[in-house]
């Protein structure tokens, strides 16, 4: 008998949601909303995912009494295709969506590229944010020393590698073929046009800008993240006031998907202390 090399976590049944496409004037964005009277937690997806990528977090947040909200940015599953020549501003799109949903203040949980836009939103509309959870994100920081670290980490050919190699840990890919297939299916559905659309930020994000943020902040990454390894997470945390940080074992750039039980425990513990 071959010993088990991974203990897979099945994707749980999803909580009931209200789905819709919000007409925000300049664009239309797909969203789902578990509703209820709990504090809103808004999930900002990675560049390879969409609103549908939070399959492990949606039911966990709803079961814990939160109003979980996911949405797809322009160009992603269910939302307007978007125009590469005018991709819009992600902070303004999110602001319009929260107004549409009647959300006065939210906890933002953002993965990877979603972290760029969560930070930009917190800088642009600080009163609308209660807390920030930023996961495995480069944060869009433009400081030259920080950019140089990224260039050392990821040589030019890195962008040509398969997305699962870039984003999922070797341990996960080796041990969980069903999970890998599920991740591929979510990625394939996330970008119907096949090309990612990258919206603008309101601010040129720098460490000096991050140091002005005073929201309670949780930072997480995987120990095998090729974008944001633990040493880079420590660098980020040093520039964020009072930031709490955790490194998740046997996870890469998608710890919320690779190690959902650990991720959800850390997230819910953080939210429960606010």
Mark where each language-model region is.
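Alpha/beta-hydrolase fold catalytic core
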Residues: 1-41, 63-66, 268-274
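Conserved HGGG/HGGXW glycine-rich cap/lid loop of the alpha/beta-hydrolase fold
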Residues: 27-80
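Conserved acidic catalytic loop of the alpha/beta-hydrolase fold
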Residues: 89-106
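Flexible "cap/lid" loop of the alpha/beta hydrolase fold
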Residues: 119-124, 130-159
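Conserved alpha/beta-hydrolase catalytic His-Asp/Glu region
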Residues: 143-144, 148, 158-212
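Short beta-strand/loop motif that positions the catalytic acidic residue
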Residues: 213, 219-221
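Acidic catalytic loop of the alpha/beta-hydrolase fold
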Residues: 224-228
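Catalytic active-site module of serine/aspartate enzymes centered on a nucleophile-bearing elbow/loop
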Residues: 243-274
């Amino acid at each position: 008998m071959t010993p088990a090399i991974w203990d897979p976590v099945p994707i749980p049944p999803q909580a009931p949601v209200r789905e819709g496409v919000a007409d925000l004037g300049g664009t239309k964005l797909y969203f789902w909303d578990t509703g209820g009277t709990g504090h809103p937690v808004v999930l900002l997806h990675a560049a390879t995912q969409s609103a549908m990528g939070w399959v492990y977090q949606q039911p966990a947040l709803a079961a814990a009494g939160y109003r979980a909200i996911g949405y797809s940015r322009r160009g992603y599953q269910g939302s307007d295709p978007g125009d590469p020549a005018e991709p819009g501003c992600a902070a303004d799109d999110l602001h319009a969506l929260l107004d549409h949903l009647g959300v006065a203040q939210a906890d933002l949980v953002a993965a990877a590229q979603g972290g760029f836009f969560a930070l930009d939103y917190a800088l642009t509309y600080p009163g609308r944010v209660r807390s920030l959870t930023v996961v495995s994100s480069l944060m869009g920081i433009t400081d030259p020393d920080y950019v140089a670290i990224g260039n050392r980490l990821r040589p030019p050919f890195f962008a040509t590698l398969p997305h699962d190699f870039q984003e999922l840990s070797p341990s996960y890919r080796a041990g969980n073929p069903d999970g890998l297939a599920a991740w591929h299916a979510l990625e394939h559905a996330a970008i119907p046009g096949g090309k990612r659309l990258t919206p603008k930020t309101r601010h040129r994000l720098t460490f000096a800008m991050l140091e002005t943020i005073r929201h309670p902040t949780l930072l997480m990454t995987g120990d095998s993240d090729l974008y944001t390894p633990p040493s880079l997470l420590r660098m980020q945390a040093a520039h964020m006031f009072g930031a709490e940080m955790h490194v998740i074992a046997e996870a890469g750039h998608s710890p919320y998907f690779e190690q959902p039980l650990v991720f959800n425990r850390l997230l819910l513990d953080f939210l429960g202390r606010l």
